[in-house]
Amino acid sequence: MIETPTVTLEEDGIIFVDFRSLLVTLDLLYDGLNQQRALAPKKKSKVLLVGQAATKVDTDMIEFGACAETVQLTAAVAIVPLSKIGWILANLFMPLQRNPYPTRAFDTIEEGREWLLSLDAG
């Protein structure tokens, strides 16, 4: 069985994507997006991504956030890296990302959630 991120629609309306110990890949991002679509079809959601680190930060990973499928379903993204390497990769990713919605990295899940809830609905 292939492991996938756990994706839940929280009571506050945030889509919580938990990669746990999985290394984030483009395929896993698309899996999470498909689960998001199933939970909140045709709705732009605020997304809280939590994980250890990505396998790499390449053009495909950077462009994922700006692709039509992702933009159609996403109002904002808070990223919470759970490891030092995750923070390094997030710092590399943030200046390169071309997301047409707010995207920020946070130290804690609580900080990411507070920021998402402070934004106007998308």
Which residues make up each language-model segment?
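Amphipathic, Lys/Arg-enriched alpha-helical "gate/interface" segment within cytosolic domains
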Residues: M1-G122
